[in-house]
């Protein structure tokens, strides 16, 4: 595992800031246990510094993963967030969408969020902003990108797309071979 380069850090933080904004500092500057981001085989891991120091005794080729996988870099050097980062993204998310019970299953099967499925949405959510999708009982289901702003949402027809699907907890089953 190695630290991220300047370009990798910039790309990663830009993607992460789309969902949690300035709360990135809460991920790194934790008073209880300091954490850092490390790269291993194009995947970015969120690791406690204590666990990272212990892992130095493991050979690089033998190390499969360490910490929480936040996502991976594509071959074109773009960053793609994984569903494994949902717990941390949901904890610090700025914008949220709550879907009704009739919209949970379509979202968990990989479909976009429609207006008919929206129960609530955070006020003043801009267009093309990263959002965390919740069930009505505040269980995080996944995350996506808004297709419309909150103001435009009010006058849309029920079949219009509100948020584009990025990742959902159903991926643990659908992509279990390639996820980790």
From Swiss-Prot:
Subunit structure: Interacts with pre-ribosome complex.
Species annotation: Schizosaccharomyces pombe (strain 972 / ATCC 24843) (Fission yeast)
Keywords associated with the record: Cytoplasm, Nucleus, Ribosome biogenesis, RNA-binding
The keyword RNA-binding appears for this protein: yes
Functional note: Required for proper 27S pre-rRNA processing and 60S ribosome subunit assembly.
GO MF entry, a single one: RNA binding
Protein name, entry field: 60S ribosome subunit biogenesis protein nip7
Superkingdom of origin organism: Eukaryota
